[in-house]
Design a protein with these regions (language model features):
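Active-site metal-binding core of divalent-cation-utilizing nuclease and nuclease-like domains
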Residues: 2-73
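Catalytic cores of nucleic-acid endonucleases
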Residues: 71, 77-134
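Short, isolated positions within intrinsically disordered regulatory regions of eukaryotic proteins
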Residues: 68, 111, 174-175
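Non-catalytic C-terminal interaction segments of nucleic acid-processing enzymes
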Residues: 1-26, 33-36, 117-175
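A residue-identity detector for tryptophan
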Residues: 30, 64, 107, 170-173
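Intrinsically disordered, low-complexity segments enriched in small/polar residues
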Residues: 49, 100-101, 146
Length: 175
């Protein structure tokens, strides 16, 4: 579940805006068991699991898998202090499958802190893009494009694992 109703509203607004040809999944923990791939022996019997995201420990507020099987992470920040706290964490928002990272903000919070946010991003994460959501979640705008990372396409087994997580979460959201 989202940390706040405002975060959930932003997740849904972005998903509605981008979701037509994309897979949008909220609150994905990249911990070891969140995305495991079954391994089968020659006779088809399950012999264990592989963990393609082993060692990754962060949680993404929203992930977006495009129709070409590239993953973009969207970090939703509803306060300036939450945004700053992101840069104090050891774990960064990157996996071998992460092609891009956006920060999403409510319009009013972004406008109030725009220059400070821009300065932090230039210094700490210049590749990140910026999305703002305003008017009760009805308006979604990309105001800074991302710089893409050299990333692997998501293998079908990992994509299915992430979609399973999404199916377990979206139905819980209520506005």
């Amino acid at each position: 579940m989202s940390k706040s109703k405002e975060e959930a509203l932003i997740q849904c607004a972005i998903a509605a805006h981008l979701g037509e040809k994309n897979i949008m999944i909220p609150n994905v923990s990249f911990a070891r068991t969140s995305c495991r791939v079954p391994k089968h022996g020659n006779n088809g019997q399950l012999i264990g699991h592989e963990y393609p995201l082993r060692g990754v420990r962060h949680e993404a507020d929203l992930i977006w898998i495009n129709e070409n099987d590239y993953l973009t992470e969207i970090e939703i920040k509803v306060s300036y202090s939450d945004f700053l706290a992101d840069f104090k964490k050891e774990e960064k928002h990157l996996t071998k499958y992460t092609r891009a990272v956006y920060y999403a903000f409510p319009w009013d919070m972004y406008k109030e802190n725009e220059e400070k946010i821009k300065k932090v991003l230039v210094e700490k994460f210049p590749e990140a893009g910026v999305i703002i959501v305003g008017m009760g979640g009805l308006a979604v705008s990309v105001i800074k494009n991302v710089e893409y990372f050299n990333a692997e396409k998501i293998p079908i087994e990992v994509k299915i694992g992430l979609m399973r997580i999404g199916c377990q979460k979206w139905w819980r959201w209520n506005a």
